[in-house]
């Protein structure tokens, strides 16, 4: 896999259409310029459609990974169910009830964690496990669903992999997939670019 080690961060994004009244908005808009709110600058880009994710990757000479590329990057060469191995612990990934410091159960689900957060370090007393894939990629399970590039004949839907902060741990297995229309966007959906 030759691609981004992490999900795309908000600070790296280019913004064309953003519903400014959306409560999940993590951007500021001032004098015609969008910027990530300081507390979200190192979090994954969310609220992006398949078309937006694809356009962003192509603008920089990359592409959305195919489902096979994504799965190979997450799994490596064996049949492990999770990018880091055989089992999951609460401090492996961001998912419902993982109890990470960013969880906000007063709203639906939990919030995203910073890109690469589950790297084996301690943050404010919270010990993470190194949850990188065999290829050293982070956030391949949990945090946000990631769009893939596959377009299947006679299907309008596009597919996402990896699970998110609003699913349970059983949906973080590498073979799990989700789908939506290509215009769908959500606080639980982001993307990763590949070369």
Residue ranges of predicted features:
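Short capping motifs at secondary-structure boundaries
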Residues: 1-3, 60-61
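Functional-site microenvironments in short loops/helix caps that host divalent-cation chemistry
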Residues: 11, 16, 20-178, 182-187
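Short, structured beta-strand segments at or near domain termini in extracellular proteins/domains
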Residues: 187-195
